[in-house]
Amino acid sequence: MTFWEPRQNMQLPPEIPQARVLVTVKTYPLPSSTYGELVCTAGLLNGEEWVRIYPIPFRFLKDNNQYPKYSWISLDLVKSTRDFRPESYRPRRGIDETIHVDEKLSTGNAWAARKEFVLREVFTSMDELIALAKGPQNKSLATLKPAEIIDLVIEEVDRDWKEKWLAQNQQGNIFETDAQGRMQERQLVRKLPFRYAYRLLSEGDTITNPTIPS
């Protein structure tokens, strides 16, 4: 069930010029054969509707285009044609999109400014979210309030990227300019040698293990 009255689902348009998004999620960079590495971002459009933004070459954005979590950003978005999930968008100009970074919400007063947005619609049942994901809505982003956090699971994984990904990066000949104006090959971000996940108990005694975005 939902915690607080749910909003009516708004049909998001195929194009959103100068979309204003409150960033709440940034994944750890993953290798890309085309762009070197990419990050998936999620947040609340106008502070209300969930959207997913991909691809973004976050580490290679100019400093004034790099955004922290819980900051407002503005950019042109178009619906992703490669992802059936309704919240999924891509920057209109791809990796060349200009991202305007505005204010970052404070953690003061027990995160009051952030809670105002992320707690507007809260689910307490993972079963309900799974049903919505499999149903006509195809819902794939939401805030879940668990009944209990059972454990934090830390699992050791491979310390190096897959050979295929390393080879793709080398074949891509992706370069950047250093401080002296010289061209040099972009280096992949260091791989995290661990996977982190919570074991959660949600309404209905459902135990889940959602992975924590780094």
Enumerate the predicted regions with their spans:
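Short, Lys/Arg- and Gly-enriched loop/turn segments at beta-strand edges
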Residues: 81-91
